[in-house]
Regions:
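Single conserved hydrophobic/aromatic residue that forms the stacking wall/gate
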Residues: 1-7, 11, 268-273
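C-terminal end segment of the histidine kinase catalytic
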Residues: 232-271
Length: 273
């Protein structure tokens, strides 16, 4: 009886060990599967971001190069050198070694390069002012989000205002969020069109940015979550304000790498990535 009882205990222990090994193996398989799903999601997200970001309108480049040629032909060499310098800086930031996350400071530099070029092309027919709080300059942003808004402000807003056009760019922090606003005093956008601008079935014809407001909106949401993106306010004959809403995340190489890979940044736990 004692022998059979002892054997029974041995069998039970073996069954428990076997069950434990099976559970551990199943757990490892589930963990590998979850890692693979996350990897595929991150790759798909990066592919979507790259595809959206690559939709930049080449006409801006062609027009700028044409302007440089005209300046050289007109012996306006200093203006031509300035345009080339601005264009080189603009594309250096645009490329960013393949990164999709850059600092707000670099994003604003890119926007200023763009507006310096446009002011020459448009013969200073509008005024531009940048007012950015210093504490947000070293925060993270998806790159190429301000320039399309500026292009939109030119085409939708101040292009036909005969020297009275004004564009203001303001950046500020509110608690755990940062905002970058592009405001113009132009023609404004009808209410029914404003409602369509950020919808996937957007029927509004955009002469301006080849990237488009919807593209910028989607890229921000893909990277930071659906609570972020663009907000648009417009009044016909009064002007338009487009507001970029981002989380406050200090830019460091570590945080940049985490965001690029689709992981939550250490300094901000509210994101739902």
């Amino acid at each position: 009886f004692c022998l059979s009882r002892g054997l029974g205990d041995v069998y039970k222990r073996q069954e428990i060990r076997h069950l434990g090994h099976s559970v551990q193996k199943s757990y490892e398989q589930i963990e590998k599967l979850m890692d693979e799903i996350i990897r595929q999601q991150n790759e798909r997200r990066k592919s979507e971001l790259d595809a959206l970001q690559s939709q930049i309108n080449p006409h801006f480049l062609y027009n700028t190069l044409d302007s440089i040629v005209w300046m050289i032909e007109g012996e306006r060499y200093e203006d031509a050198v300035f345009m080339i310098t601005q264009l080189a800086s603009l594309f250096r930031i645009s490329l960013s070694r393949g990164k999709t996350i850059i600092s707000v400071e670099d994003e604003i530099k890119h926007a200023k390069n763009y507006m310096n070029i446009q002011k020459i092309r448009y013969k200073n027919s509008f005024a531009i002012d940048f007012s950015i709080e210093e504490e947000i300059l070293h925060c993270c942003t998806v790159k190429l989000v301000v320039q399309p808004l500026l292009e939109n402000a030119i085409y939708y807003g101040v292009e036909c205002m005969d020297g009275d056009g004004e564009i203001d760019v303001n950046g500020y922090r509110r608690e755990d969020d940062i905002y970058i606003e592009v405001r113009d005093n132009g023609l404004g956008i009808p209410e029914d069109e404003v409602e369509q601008l950020l919808k996937e079935n957007n029927r509004v014809h955009k002469r301006g940015s080849g990237v488009g407001l919807l593209n910028v909106h989607n890229r921000i949401r893909l990277r930071f979550g659906e609570e972020y993106g663009l907000e648009i306010e417009s009044e016909p004959d009064e002007g338009t304000t487009v507001r970029i809403h981002l989380p406050y995340i200090v830019y460091t190489p570590e945080e940049q790498e985490r965001l690029e890979s689709g992981r939550k940044p250490v300094s901000y736990t509210h994101l739902t990535l």
